[in-house]
Amino acid sequence: MADRFSRFNEDRDFQGNHFDQYEEGHLEIEQASLDKPIESDNIGHRLLQKHGWKLGQGLGKSLQGRTDPIPIVVKYDVMGMGRMEMELDYAEDATERRRVLEVEKEDTEELRQKYKDYVDKEKAIAKALEDLRANFYCELCDKQYQKHQEFDNHINSYDHAHKQRLKDLKQREFARNVSSRSRKDEKKQEKALRRLHELAEQRKQAECAPGSGPMFRPTTVAVDEDGGEEDKDESSTNSGASAVSSCGFGADFSTDKGGSFTSVQITNTTGLSQAPGLASQGISFGIKNNLGPPLQKLGVSFSFAKKAPVKLESIASVFKDHAEEGSSEDGTKADEKSSDQGVQKVGDTDGTGNLDGKKEDEDPQDGGSLASTLSKLKRMKREEGTGATEPEYYHYIPPAHCKVKPNFPFLLFMRASEQMEGDHSAHSKSAPENRKSSSPKPQGCSKTAASPGAERTVSEASELQKEAAVAGPSEPGGKTETKKGSGGGEDEQSVESRETSESPMCESNPKDISQATPATKAGQGPKHPTGPFFPVLSKDESTALQWPSELLIFTKAEPSISYSCNPLYFDFKLSRNKDAKAKGTEKPKDVAGSSKDHLQSLDPREPNKSQEEEQDVVLSSEGRVDEPASGAACSSLNKQEPGGSHMSETEDTGRSHPSKKEPSGKSHRHKKKKKHKKSSKHKRKHKADTEEKSSKAESGEKSKKRKKRKRKKNKSSAAADSERGPKSEPPGSGSPAPPRRRRRAQDDSQRRSLPAEEGNSGKKDDGGGGSSCQDHSGRKHKGEPPTSSCQRRANTKHSSRSSHRSQPSSGDEDSDDASSHRLHQKSPSQYSEEEEEEEEEEEEEDEDSGSEHSRSRSRSGHRHSSHRSSRRSYSSSSDASSDQSCYSRQHSYSDDSYSDYSDRSRRHSKRSHDSDDSDYTSSKHRSKRHKYSSSDDDYSLSCSQSRSRSRSHTRERSRSRGRSRSSSCSRSRSKRRSRSTTAHSWQRSRSYSRDRSRSTRSPSQRSGSRKGSWGHESPEERRSGRRDFIRSKIYRSQSPHYFQSGRGEGPGKKEDGRGDDSKGAGLPSQNSNTGTGRGSESDCSPEDKNSVTARLLLEKIQSRKVERKPNVCEEVLATPNKAGLKYKNPPQGYFGPKLPPSLGNKPVLPMIGKLPATRKSNKKCEESGLERGEEQEHSEPEEGSPRSSDAPFGHQFSEEAAGPLSDPPPEEPKSEEATADHSVAPLGTPAHTDCYPGDPAISHNYLPDPSDGDTLESLDSGSQPGPVESSLLPIAPDLEHFPNYAPPSGEPSIESTDGTEDASLAPLESQPITFTPEEMEKYSKLQQAAQQHIQQQLLAKQVKAFPASTALAPATPALQPIHIQQPATASATSITTVQHAILQHHAAAAAAAIGIHPHPHPQPLAQVHHIPQPHLTPISLSHLTHSIIPGHPATFLASHPIHIIPASAIHPGPFTFHPVPHAALYPTLLAPRPAAAAATALHLHPLLHPIFSGQDLQHPPSHGT
C-alpha cells in the first residue's frame, strides 16, 4: 500500500491543492482524511497497532489524544496568511490619513506654512548636501563621493594621480602639437609660397627650355596681382587674356599672411608653345586658341563643401583673383595653403618627375601639384574666359556622404559650350579625380588632348607640370622621357608629352597639346583647358579663380560640368596614391554619368583618388601629348580619370587611329597611366561605359590609352615616385625622380615600378625592383584596377622587360609599355619570346619582388597582349572609360583579362594570342568596349579571361608541373588562345584564362606567359613561377604591400605577385588581383584589408605549410579578395538585372565552395582558398601532380570559384553581344561564384548580367569591381568551359571550353552567386559556423543547412565553383581538372545545396574537368536550385549543371578518376557525405574551403566531392 501513496505520484493543481495520482491498477483509491478515523487497512493504523495502540484510544502517554479526526478547515485566504490583516491596517491608515487631509483642508494656511517651511528646510538640507557633495566630487575622474574619507582616499589614489598625470601630459602634448602644427603650417605655407614662386620662375625658365617642352610649366598661377586678377578677368573676358593669364596664372595665390603669392607670371605662352614640339601657342592660349573659339567663357563656380571654413577659404583664396583677394582673406590663407599644397603636389609630382621636386617632394609636392593644378585651373578659367562664354556655373556641394573632403570641397560645374567643356575635359583629365568627367566633351577634350598627342589635358599637364616641375630643373627626367620617346615614335611623342607634362610648363604643354590636339581632337568635342589652372568663376561670378586643372573634372555632357575639389582639400599625394584606388572605384560611378554620381563617387573616394587620379591623369594627359601615344594615353586617361568620360570618348576616337600606330608609346604611357588608372579606371570605366560603348576604335583608344597610360605611368612614376618616393624614398627624389624617369625611360619596368611605388606609396620601395613592383602592384591594386590590368599588361609586357621590372614598378610599367611597344612591334614570336624572356626575368624578379613583380610581370604580359592587341592593356586602362558601360567594362575586362592572359598567352603563343587579341579586340571591343570603356572592360574581361586562362593555365600548369604541366598549360593556352581567336571563344578563353591565371597566376601565369611559345614553359619558369608564387604569396602576406595592394589589389596583387612570379599562375593572380584586388582595394579596401590580413595570416601559415600551395592559396585568396572586393561598387548593370542592386557593393563570394565571405569571405576565401588550395595541392600531389598543379588547381578552384566568374567573360562577350545584361552577369557571376558562393541569385545575376563586364571592370576600376569580376570572371570561364568543354586533357578542354565558355558559360556564369556584403558576412559566418558544425552535424546540417546555406549563398558558391571546375580543370591537366572538379564539386555541392544549377549544363563537368563523366556526374541542380535557392531560380537556370567530381576522383589517386556514382557525388555534396556534404552545404567543405588546415585535401573523396 505504500506505493499507492508514493509522493512522486502526487500532483498539485495551480492553487497548490494536491491530488494523489495513482498508477493504473490502484482502483480502490483510499483518500486519507481527517474527517474520519483511521481505517484498519491504513498503514498508520497498522503501525500504531504495532506500537500497542488500539482503535478508539487517544494517542499519547495517557491516551489524551483525540480519537475523532481533527476537522481541517482550509482557509483559502486570497492574500495569504496575515495578508488580510495587513491590508486592513493599510485601509485604516489610509482612512486616518484621509481624515488628516480633510483636516488639512480646513487648516490650509497653517498647514501650508508648515508645509512650506518643511519644504524649504528640505531644500536647504538638499542644497547643503549638494554643496557638501560637490566638495567630494572629482571632476578629473568624474566621480562623486559621499564621504570625506572616500574623497580623500580617492584623491590620494593612484588612479586619480594617474589621470592627473595623463591629463597634464595630454595638455602639454596638445600644446606642443598645436604649436608645432601651427609652425608646420606656417612652414608649409611658406614652403608652398616659395614653391609656387619657384615654380612660377621655373615656368618662366621652362618656357625657355623647348627641348623638354616647358619643363616647368607654371604650375602655380603666379602672376602679378594685377596680372593674376587680370588673368582671371581675362579668362572671363577673352581668350587672349586667358591664355596669358593661364600661362601666367595671373591669379595670385593670396596667403593667409595676406601677402599674395608672389606672382611669378610665367608667360606660358612661350612655355606652353615650348612644350616639346607640341604647339607654338605657348600659354594656356595653346588650348585656348584651340579651344578658345569653341570655349565660351564658362562660368565656373566652385561650391565648397561645408568643410573647415578655413580650408575652404584657403581654397577660395588660392584660386581667388586679385579682385577676390580682399574678399578672400581667408582665401588667402587657403590660397597659401592651397598653394602650399599645390606646390607640394607639384613638388611631389615634380619631385617624382624631376629632381626639382626633391625639395617639394614632401610638402611642396602637394603644394606644387596643387599649384600646378591651380595654374591649370586658372588657365582653364582663363581659357574659359577666353571662350568668353557667359559664365554658367553650377555649384555642387559634395553630398554629406562624400567622404573625400579633400577631393571635393566643392564642385565646379562648368556649363558651357564644348569649347569650355573641352577645356574642362582637359581639366577633367587633370582633375578627373575631383571632377567627375560626366561630360563627354571634357573627357573628350582631355582624351582628345591626349589623342592628338599634342594636347595634354590640364590634368596631364598638371601632372606633367608637377612631374616636369621636378623634372624640369633636372631635365634628365625629360631627357629620359625623350630617350624613352626616342625608343619609339609613339614613345617619343609620349616622351614629348611626358616631358612637356613633366616640365612645370605643363601648362603650356596642355595648351600646346590642345593646339596640336585640335586636329587629332578635331571631332573630340569640347576642349577643356589644359593649363595647370583653370579659371573658375567664383560663386559671385565676379572673380575667376585659377583652379588647379587637376582638381577639375569635366563631365562629358554637352554643357561640360566641371567637378572640382578644394585644392586645399585635394591631397595630391593622396590623390595619386588613392588615385588608383578611387579612380577605379569612381570611374564606374562616373559612368553613372551624373556629375553628382561622380561627385558622390568621387567625393567620398575621389578626393584622394581624384588627387591621385589627377596626378595620374596629369601623367596620363601628358602621355596623351604624344599624338600617337596621345590616343592611347588619352584613352587610358579616359578610362583612368574620373573625367575620363569625355576623355574616353576622345580617347576612343583619338585612340582608335593612334592606337595602332603607337601601341608602344601608348603602351608605355598607358602603363604609366595604368597605375594612375587604378582609381581613374573606374571612372574611366563608367565614362567608357557611356562613351566607349560606341567607341569602335577601341584598339586605337586602347593604344592611346596605353600610351597615355604609359605616359601617365612615367609621369606618375615620376610623380608617384616622388610622391611615394617620399614614403619609400624621399619625394625629394626629384633627383632620384629624373633618374627614375630615366630608368623608366630606360626600363618601362621601372616606370611601372614607379607607379607601383606611387600606388604603394613606396610600401615596397625596399628595392627598385621587387619593391617598386610591389608598390606598383599595390598601387595598382589600391586604386587602379584598370591600371592594374594595364599594369598587368605592362607587367606582362614587362615580362619581356622582367629585368626592368626588378626596377621600380613605375619604371617597370613604363618599361613595360615601352617593352610592350617594342614587343608589339616585334613579331608575335619575338614578342612572345621577349615576353617570355622578360617573364622569366620577371619570374626571377618576381621571386625577388614577389607579388609586385609578379603583378608587374603579369601586367607586362598583359600589356604586351594589350599592346599587341591594339593596346588591349590600355583597354584595361580604359577601365575608367569602361565605366562608360558595365558592358563596356565587361568588354574591357575581357580585353584586359585577355590581354593579361593573352600576354601570357602571347608569351605562350603570340600568334594565338594575337588572334585572341584581335578577336578580342574585334569581338570584345565590339561588345564590351562599346558597352563600357574598352580599356576598363578589356581589363575586366581580360583580367577575367586572362585570369581564367591563366588559371586554366595554372591548372594546366599545376597538372603539367605535376605531370606535363608545361605541355598542358601550353596546350590549354594554345587552345584557349585559338579559342580566343573567336570573340566568344576568346572571351571565354580569356575569361577562363584569367580564371585559370587567377587560379594559377603564379604557376600558370608564369607558365603561360613564360610559355610565350605555347609549350615554352621552362622548368625555371615553372620553378620560378611556383617559387615566386609561393614567395609572392608569402611576401605579399608578409609585406605591407600585401595589405596595401593585397588589400585593394591585395589578393590580386598578391596573386599578381605570385602570379607574376609564376606567370602562368601569376596571371590569374594578377588578373584576380587586378580584377578583384582592385575591387577589393578600392571597394572593399577595409574589408579587403581585413580579408587580406586574415588571408595574410592564412597565407603565411599555409605558405609555410604548403609552399606549393601558395599558388593556389594566393590565387584563391586573391580571388576571394578580388571577388569580394570587386563588387563593392560595380555598376548596377554590371551584374545585370538579376544581380541584386546591392550586388554592386556586395562582396563577391566565391561560388566555388571557396567559402569567402565578403571580406570575411575574402579572408575565408583566403583561408579556404589557401586551405582548399592546400587540400587540392595535397590531393593533387597525392594524385601525382606537383604543388604547382595543386596550387594552380587550388587557385583554379579558388580561382575557379573566381575563375568561372572570370570565365564568364567569354560567355560574357557572347552574352555581351547578345545580351549585355546577361553577358555581364556571366562574367561577373563566375567571379561572384568565386567570391560569392552565398548568393545564388546574385551569382546568377552577376554572371549573366551584361553589366558583368562592367562590374568586373567596375570592380576592377571602380570599386575595383573589375578585379572582383576578374576574380569572378575566372570562375565564369571555367564554368563556361563546362558546356563546350570536351574533356580533352585538361588544358585543351579548357581551351575548347574557353571557346565554349563564351556560349555556355553564361548560364553557369550567370549562376554564380553574388552576395551583398551582408549576405557575404552572413555567408561567411554561416560558413564558419557550418564548417565548425559541419563535422559535428554534417549530415543533418548539410541536409538542413545546405539549402539554407545555399539560400544564404554559401552552398551555392560551392556548387557554382563546381562548374567553374570544368573549364579550369579542362584547361589544367586531369589533376587540375580533378582538383577543379573537386573544387567545383564543392561548389556544385554548395550549388546543389543552393540549387545553383537549375538546369544541367549540356556539357557536363567532366568535359571541363576532363574527369570521367562518372566522376563529374553532372549534378543538375535545377531541381535543387529552386528549392534551395528559391529566390533566384534564373540565377541558377543559366548556370551550368553542377558537375561534381567525387573526391575520389580528385583525391590522391593517380589522376585516374574513379567513376563515382552521381548519387555519391551529389549526395556527398549535399548531405550524404557528413564532412564533405556539411562542408559543401556550408561551403565550408575543407576542399571547398580549406579554411581549416586539418581539412586539407586529405579529406577523403567523400569530403572531396
UniProtKB/Swiss-Prot annotation:
Residues 223-233, 832-849 have a biased composition (Acidic residues). It holds the Pfam family G-patch. The modification N6-acetyllysine is found at residue 479. There is a cross-link at residues 311, 573, 1109 (Glycyl lysine isopeptide (Lys-Gly) (interchain with G-Cter in SUMO2)). Residues 166-175, 182-206, 322-339, 421-436, 575-612, 648-665, 688-702, 745-767, 1017-1031, 1050-1063, 1097-1112, 1163-1185, 1211-1220 have a biased composition (Basic and acidic residues). GO terms for biological process: hemopoiesis; mRNA splicing, via spliceosome. Residues 666-687, 703-715, 794-804, 856-871, 923-932 have a biased composition (Basic residues). Residues 166-244, 322-393, 419-537, 575-1304 are annotated as: Disordered. GO terms for molecular function: mRNA binding; zinc ion binding. The modification Phosphoserine is found at residues 648, 733, 735, 753, 915, 918, 985, 1013, 1018, 1037, 1039, 1085, 1179. Residues 89-124 form a coiled coil. Keywords: Acetylation, Coiled coil, Isopeptide bond, Metal-binding, Phosphoprotein, Ubl conjugation, Zinc, Zinc-finger. Residues 872-900 have a biased composition (Low complexity). Residues 40-86 form the G-patch domain. The keyword Coiled coil applies. Residues 437-449 have a biased composition (Polar residues). A zinc finger (C2H2-type) spans 136-160. This is G patch domain-containing protein 8.
